[in-house]
């Protein structure tokens, strides 16, 4: 089994991973709800060099589920042929933060697009008062 440092080194240097991290593709996050049911949800994510990070409103059901069971898996993949696929498993930690965390803004940038980013960010900062910042290691 690889160590966390070895995994980080791979994620920070592999050209296929770099392609996926730069692509406008959400992660498909798999988790288990408190009643034991599996769920998959798309999330905009960020790799910070040591962990994957995403943010959600703290009242979303996925946050309660992750508190009850922090084990997750996710995939990021292309639809081209041949497909490029990154599959990750890990454990989450959750921090409630005031306002909109920069990680959320940066994670959303690839999906929203630079041409719409200024307006999107203004609206999000006006409407969101707190978020759950989720770190996957």
Predicted features and spans:
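A generic structural signal for nonpolar/aromatic side chains embedded in well-ordered alpha-helices
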Residues: 20-21, 66, 107, 136
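Short, basic/aromatic recognition patches
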Residues: 2-28
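Structural motif corresponding to alpha-helix initiation and N-cap regions
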Residues: 14, 59-60, 117
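Short, surface-exposed beta-strand-loop junctions and turns on beta-sheet-rich folds
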Residues: 60-62, 81
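A short, polar/charged loop/turn motif at coil->beta-strand junctions and beta-hairpin connectors
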Residues: 20-23, 82, 130
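Charged, gly/pro-rich active-site loop segments
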Residues: 1-11, 84-137
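Short beta-strand segments
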Residues: 24-58, 66, 73-76, 86-88
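Short secondary-structure boundary/capping segments
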Residues: 18-19, 44, 64, 124-126
């Amino acid at each position: 089994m690889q160590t966390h440092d070895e995994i980080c080194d791979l994620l920070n240097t592999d050209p296929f991973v770099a392609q996926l991290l730069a692509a406008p593709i959400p992660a498909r996050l798999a988790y288990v709800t408190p009643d034991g049911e599996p769920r998959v949800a798309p999330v905009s994510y960020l790799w910070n060099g040591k962990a994957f990070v995403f943010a959600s409103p703290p009242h979303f059901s996925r946050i309660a589920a992750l508190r009850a069971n922090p084990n997750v898996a996710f995939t990021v993949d292309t639809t081209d042929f041949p497909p490029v696929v990154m599959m990750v498993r890990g454990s989450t930690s959750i921090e409630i933060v005031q306002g909109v965390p920069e990680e959320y803004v940066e994670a959303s940038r690839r999906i929203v697009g630079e041409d719409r980013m200024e307006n999107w960010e203004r609206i999000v900062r006006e409407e969101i008062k707190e978020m759950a910042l989720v770190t996957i290691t």
